[in-house]
Design a protein with these regions (language model features):
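Two-component histidine phosphotransfer core
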Residues: 1-115, 119-127, 135
């Protein structure tokens, strides 16, 4: 294993949502980002993936950790990319590709927020507004 005893993870998903298709490697890229950039030396990092129903046609996919979080420069780059589509050196390829794929598949029916938790760690919130045929 590449990072032995460096992190632990927990995945929770409401039973009714398990039938909703989620594009491959979307969640994995954000989890990979948490592992690659969020680990604190000598401290166990907790990574959580939660998938929950917000309303009849909306689900929330949340990836969060208690690691180092994003630097201010990285958060600025993320915000600029999410709002204007401008890619900077501070922004990772994985985030760009995942956001681009989500927007390609869901268009304006997808909301993405990337931010730091108050004490430590990063959070990625992906809200999908599903079609009636996809709803849970």
């Amino acid at each position: 294993m590449r990072y032995p005893n460096a992190f632990d993870y927990k995945v929770t998903c409401e039973e009714a949502i398990k039938i909703v298709p989620i594009p491959p490697f979307i969640i994995e890229s954000f989890v990979g980002n948490a592992i690659k950039h969020g680990l604190k030396p000598g401290k166990m990092t907790e990574i959580q993936v939660n998938v929950s129903k917000l309303e009849e046609f909306r689900i929330l996919i949340q990836v969060k950790d208690n690691g180092t979080g994003f630097s201010d420069d990285s958060l600025d780059a993320v915000e600029e990319f999410l709002e204007k589509g401008i890619v900077s050196e501070e922004l990772g390829v994985g985030i760009c590709n995942s956001v681009a794929r989500l927007r390609l598949i869901y268009g304006d029916k997808c909301e993405i927020r990337i931010y730091n938790q108050e004490l430590s760690g990063a959070v990625v919130d992906i809200t999908l507004n599903l079609q009636k045929t996809e709803a849970v």
